[in-house]
A protein has these predicted regions:
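Sec-dependent signal peptide recognition
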Residues: 1-2
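C-terminal motif of bacterial Sec signal peptides marking the signal peptidase cleavage site
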Residues: 7-11
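OB-fold nucleic-acid-binding modules
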Residues: 13-83, 87-324
Length: 324
């Protein structure tokens, strides 16, 4: 009860027992020296662990200063593909970041809306090269190589997340990549940003030990709490290639390969669209091999736990963002 009372005065939401029009937060609610850019926040992490360094994998840095970041919402979990995450973008520093929240974020945070985040007590974590902002990890999280954890209850969300004014995404909020500029205009500074990839080619085939398109079957054997994962080819299983697997109440992630050229998924200009079996477009058919089109997605990076086998992945908000 004491905690709840404190948070009712210091948090970002109204008192549920005394409802009133929702507060719309603005810069005027914070001291000028509190507000920093998303890039400046990330640089706190990079001051300890250099960008791209394997030394930072699975590590976190707790924020001890009373910093506030702001950004526009650039993600939506309404289609079921984004899970327990909210991505925001700061036009000032042209940087984006993932906030580790809970589910149904689209109900509370709308695309284009400004969000303020009180970061003190939160943790910047590095999972497979992607920097996110959440709460400090538990020992159990660290054992699983998770560098931070979700704001898993409303009290934490109320304390740290401050909804601002509604708005719209503009052309300035989306980085445009084409076959002629991908080699120079796109780098790891854009991780966590909303990017429109124009003129991509859909590919089928093998890269290393992986075949595309494919899905990852997760089987829990003999009551085990950890799954055994097996990558399977739609074609070999006699299935129509779709963005993900969703049959007989079994839902698995699917992976599809899109490219600007090259022969492997590790070549620059090659991207994996990874889609949840819980998304509402899981069973949409993939394009014909060689087809070209555009994809708008959150730009992300993924690797093995040791930092090898790096791929760049595209996190799609909605099937409407895939135009083939």
């Amino acid at each position: 009860m004491v905690v709840a009372a404190v948070l009712s005065f210091t948090g970002c939401y109204n008192d549920f027992d005394d409802p009133a029009p929702a507060k719309v937060w603005t810069e005027a609610d914070f001291n000028k020296d509190q507000i920093i850019t998303i890039k400046q926040l990330k640089d706190i992490y990079y001051a300890k662990y250099a960008p791209g360094s394997t030394a930072g994998l699975g590590k976190y840095v707790e924020i001890t200063e009373d910093y506030v970041i702001r950004g526009k919402v650039i993600s939506s979990d309404q289609a079921g593909n984004v899970y327990k995450s909210l991505y925001i973008y700061d036009e000032t520093s042209q940087s984006g970041i993932e906030l580790k929240l809970m589910v149904s974020n689209y109900v509370y945070y709308h695309m284009g809306q400004t969000i303020y985040v009180k970061t003190k007590g939160m943790a910047l974590g590095n999972y497979r090269y992607m920097i996110s902002l959440g709460m400090p990890p538990t020992e159990a999280d660290i054992e699983k190589n998770y560098a931070n954890r979700n704001l898993e209850n409303q009290l934490l969300i109320n304390e740290h997340i401050c909804p601002g004014a509604m708005g719209e995404l503009t052309e300035n909020d989306v980085l445009v990549i084409t076959p002629s500029n991908y080699e120079t205009a796109l780098n790891d500074d854009a991780l966590g940003r909303l990017v429109r990839f124009e003129g991509l080619t859909y590919k089928e085939g093998t890269s290393g030990n992986n075949f595309y398109p494919s899905y990852v079957e997760a089987i829990y054997e003999n009551g085990k709490t950890e799954a055994t994962y097996t990558s399977k080819s739609y074609i070999s299983e006699g299935l129509t290639p779709t963005y993900a697997y969703s049959y007989n109440n079994q839902r698995y992630y699917g992976s599809a390969w899109f490219s600007y050229g090259g022969t492997t998924t590790e070549d620059k200009g090659n991207y994996i669209v990874r889609v949840s079996g819980y998304s509402n477009f899981a069973l949409q058919p993939l394009p014909e091999a060689g087809a070209t089109g555009d994809i708008t997605a959150i730009y992300t990076k993924y690797s093995s736990s040791s930092g090898g086998f790096i791929t760049y992945q595209l996190l799609v908000n909605s099937f409407n963002d895939i135009n083939f």
